[in-house]
Amino acid sequence: MPADSMEKPTASPIAGAPANSAQTPDKPKSASEHRKSSKPIMEKRRRARINESLGQLKTLILDALKKDSSRHSKLEKADILEMTVKHLRNLQRVQMTAALTADPSVLGKYRAGFNECMNEVTRFLSTCEGVNTEVRTRLLGHLSSCLGQIVAMNYQQPPSSQQPVHVQLPSSTPVPMPCKVNPAEAISPKVFQGGFQLVPATDGQFAFLIPNPAYTSSPGPVIPLYANATSPGGPPSQSPVQGLTSFAHKMPHMAQAVSPLGGSTRADSAESVWRPW
């Protein structure tokens, strides 16, 4: 074959390309890099969910309060949340009133729970040294005032399986003494050592009164307690009145909180106590 008829070999563009230009698979991103890259997207979605929920909440709360939405078109997020909280509190009060009317035992549970919380606050303040005396006195005075309002509420007759026991809050130094009383045996007034008096009533109820020299003209608030009623032939029911904490050496004129139920009775009780907070 003639030499001039032979084609000269030409360099291939692919063959002449450098080796590092070959396509390589991308490296997988680490977890931290993935979170960093997806954080703006997640933040955008979160804000969208919040705004959507607030918009729905605004519509619901304005309809519930029967307000014109055109006049409240520029409500801030804080205003919407505050209006919702107030509305839910009002609903809670209405539901509590309806429950008190339908179930007479609800008020007793509420009183017992409030008194239990007040007793815990009193016990803490009597042992805590860092609390100012003025603040302590004001706080316990406010709780005593609230307790008096709760006691003044209308209370229906509890079921026959329970007998209410009324305990008067003392302001002088009380003497912790457990009391075991059988309602069937409470026929006449009995006076115990220390001036404690048991006064029966005609309807089967009885009151356990503690002497209160500082408030002889105006008796203190009375808290109902409950003990399981038993038949005259059965064993006497026990209603220990315990937890009489006293710090009269610091505040002699403050009312003391009385635990509505003893420790063993509280542990064995099948019904839970509703706490107001």
Swiss-Prot record:
Keywords: Developmental protein, Differentiation, DNA-binding, Myogenesis, Neurogenesis, Notch signaling pathway, Nucleus, Repressor, Transcription, Transcription regulation. Pfam families: Hairy_orange, HLH. InterPro entries: bHLH_dom (IPR011598), HES_HEY (IPR050370), HLH_DNA-bd_sf (IPR036638), Orange_dom (IPR003650). Residues 110-143 form the Orange domain. GO terms for molecular function: protein heterodimerization activity; RNA polymerase II cis-regulatory region sequence-specific DNA binding; sequence-specific DNA binding. GO terms for biological process: floor plate development; lens development in camera-type eye; muscle organ development; negative regulation of apoptotic process; negative regulation of DNA-templated transcription; negative regulation of skeletal muscle tissue development; negative regulation of transcription by RNA polymerase II; neural crest formation. Residues 1-44, 258-277 are annotated as: Disordered. SUPFAM superfamilies: HLH, helix-loop-helix DNA-binding domain (SSF47459), Orange domain-like (SSF158457). Dynamically expressed in the borders of several tissue territories. Expressed in the pre-placodal ectoderm (PPE) from gastrula stage. During gastrulation, expressed in the deep layer of the dorsal lip, the Spemann organizer and three distinct regions in the prospective neuroectoderm: neural plate border, presumptive floor plate/notoplate and anterior neural plate. The keyword Transcription regulation applies. The keyword Transcription applies. Has a particular type of basic domain (presence of a helix-interrupting proline) that binds to the N-box (CACNAG), rather than the canonical E-box (CANNTG). The C-terminal WRPW motif is a transcriptional repression domain necessary for the interaction with Groucho/TLE family members, transcriptional corepressors recruited to specific target DNA by Hairy-related proteins. The WPRW motif is also required for the inductive function, independent of a transcription regulation activity. Transcriptional repressor. Binds DNA on N-box motifs: 5'-CACNAG-3'. Promotes floor plate development and prechordal plate development. Required for lens development as early as the stage of lens field formation, partly through regulation of gene expression of the cell cycle inhibitor cdknx/p27(xic1). This is Transcription factor HES-4-B. It comes from Xenopus laevis. The lineage of its organism: Eukaryota, Metazoa, Chordata, Craniata, Vertebrata.
